[in-house]
Amino acid sequence: MLAKPTIKRRESTKIYVGNVPIGGDAPIAVQSMTNTRTTDVEATVAQIKALERVGADIVRVSVPTMDAAEAFKLIKQQVNVPLVADIHFDYRIALKVAEYGVDCLRINPGNIGREDRIRAVVDCARDNNIPIRIGVNAGSLEKDLQEKYGEPTPEALLESALRHVEILDRLNFDQFKVSVKASDVFLAVESYRLLAKAIKQPLHLGITEAGGFRAGAVKSAVGLGMLLAEGIGDTLRISLAADPVEEIKVGFDILKSLRIRSRGINFIACPTCSRQEFDVIGTVNALEQRLEDIITPMDVSIIGCVVNGPGEALVSDLGVTGGNKKSGYYLDGERQKERFDNDDLINQLEAKIRAKVAAQDPKNRII
């Protein structure tokens, strides 16, 4: 197997969102946000459970009204994953969801009004062991910062974040994480770099409003990949105009590609050419769908010919190399006497993968 790259993780304090550690030496948590009406309890619960099934560590829910807060109470009772309540402007909503067992508050102290209101929320969070996420966004910078800098800049996002941090520091509250999101990759990356040097709190990564599935996934992979490779980031959310389930899958794929955290099978497959001896694309697509239930980390190479196939198989947990009517089979980097019939390759490969998972990791764990 390939050696794991060395990424020196930025030192940060550790907080807990429910039972999920964020920061310090904790695994980088992957989260998403519901896009249902929160007052539609049934739909919201169904979406949260779908996110849980694909590995979401944390789920954020928008709570814009008191009616939504009452719905949040019912939602919280029906799910297991930690929930973050996304709240703006009305501090009373924060107090209400705290009463209902929220695991984290996404709330900017500076936009909920007078000092006494801020103190009420912070005191409530402290009394109930609820962390706070300060979430700065390039699209909603304070007016004075827009006037000062003329446009969103890394320095403007940093100054906004530090304003909110200063409020919590003044109130002796240190259980918080911070994000400085932008839809522009370079703006977001440089803002996070500045913030990483300025504070010790955990950082929540994201390229906000990244776009539809394809463009948003690419933007997020580029931006977050740059930061993660530098050791910056303690939790992440991929923002897509798509099914939130896809956000979790893309998030894990980014971490998997950097070998930071793995979930499920990492398929290594050739783009195909006229040398392929079997339908590589169809095989990979079918296996990705069939094996979504597997969370044990594993590298599986599926190469259509003998040019690169043997080399990839040598560094894979399980590999197949295309041959005439029958394809070569590798296990833990060693070629096996057994060969696969190309006409039944998908079924045979699925059986071998499941057998290896059962032998290697009976509990099918995630790392």
From Swiss-Prot:
Protein's UniProt name: 4-hydroxy-3-methylbut-2-en-1-yl diphosphate synthase (flavodoxin)
Give the family this protein belongs to, as stated in its UniProt record: Belongs to the IspG family.
- Gene3D superfamilies attached to this UniProt entry: Dihydropteroate synthase-like (3.20.20.20), Sulfite Reductase Hemoprotein, domain 1 (3.30.413.10)
Q: Which UniProt keywords apply?
A: 4Fe-4S, Iron, Iron-sulfur, Isoprene biosynthesis, Metal-binding, Oxidoreductase
> Which coenzyme or cofactor does it need?
[4Fe-4S] cluster
Name the InterPro entries on file. Dihydropteroate_synth-like_sf, IspG_bac, IspG_bac-typ, NO2/SO3_Rdtase_4Fe4S_sf
Recorded GO terms, molecular function? 4 iron, 4 sulfur cluster binding; 4-hydroxy-3-methylbut-2-en-1-yl diphosphate synthase activity (ferredoxin); 4-hydroxy-3-methylbut-2-enyl-diphosphate synthase activity (flavodoxin); iron ion binding
Pathway given for this chain reads: Isoprenoid biosynthesis; isopentenyl diphosphate biosynthesis via DXP pathway; isopentenyl diphosphate from 1-deoxy-D-xylulose 5-phosphate: step 5/6
User: Which residues make up the binding site for [4Fe-4S] cluster?
Assistant: 270, 273, 305, 312
Per UniProt, the cofactor note for this protein states: Binds 1 [4Fe-4S] cluster.
Q: What is its EC number?
A: 1.17.7.3
Gene Ontology annotations of biological process type: isopentenyl diphosphate biosynthetic process, methylerythritol 4-phosphate pathway; terpenoid biosynthetic process
Gene for this chain:
ispG
Per its database record, what is this protein's job? Converts 2C-methyl-D-erythritol 2,4-cyclodiphosphate (ME-2,4cPP) into 1-hydroxy-2-methyl-2-(E)-butenyl 4-diphosphate.
Q: In which domain of life is the source organism classified?
A: Bacteria
Q: Which organism is it from?
A: Pasteurella multocida (strain Pm70)
The chemistry this enzyme catalyses reads: (2E)-4-hydroxy-3-methylbut-2-enyl diphosphate + oxidized [flavodoxin] + H2O + 2 H(+) = 2-C-methyl-D-erythritol 2,4-cyclic diphosphate + reduced [flavodoxin]
